[in-house]
């Protein structure tokens, strides 16, 4: 599986990529025409000041944790539903997902969306696929009801069999 290989950079592939970046790179990146963004920050952190030009931005605030407790805000089912709605709305648009490090929360969101939408994934900050398990599980839960309502069998497959390994196998090179 190639998640950070940039050798195949045809314009068609570049437009289909789901890019996962750390915040420091996301804020200085100029978006492609029609590109959309999912921006993930900690709840009380300032929003990322992204370059102008994104067709749409979904801003979410939750901590990079995989368990409820303490003073942490975990990804909620509502967050997950918003991600799926955004993905469905912009299924053909270039997509960039970022969080602080670009290595856990955004990897979970990017991996799930790439598998569901049958798009290649590019990880910029890491070559290790370690998505936040809570994030993936919230997306799987939200995907179940959406998949039945929309009769989206690919989404249902991601929801039912959405382990990190199985999601990764669904992503085209």
Regions found by a protein language model. Name each.
Residues 58-96, 129:
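Helix-loop module immediately N-terminal to the HCX5R catalytic loop
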Residues 32, 78, 82, 104-108:
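Short, well-structured alpha-helical interface segments that form or flank functional binding sites
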Residues 88-94, 111-173:
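PTP/DSP superfamily signal
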Residues 46-47, 68, 104-108:
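Short catalytic/ligand-binding loop motif for oxyanion handling, primarily in non-cytosolic enzymes
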Residues 95-112:
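A phosphate-binding catalytic loop at a beta-strand-loop-alpha-helix junction
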Residues 2-60:
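Glycine-rich, flexible N-terminal cofactor/catalytic loop recognition
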Residues 1-14, 161, 166-173:
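Short, low-complexity, intrinsically disordered N-terminal peptides in bacterial proteins
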Residues 51-54, 110-114:
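Short, glycine/charged-enriched secondary-structure capping and boundary segments
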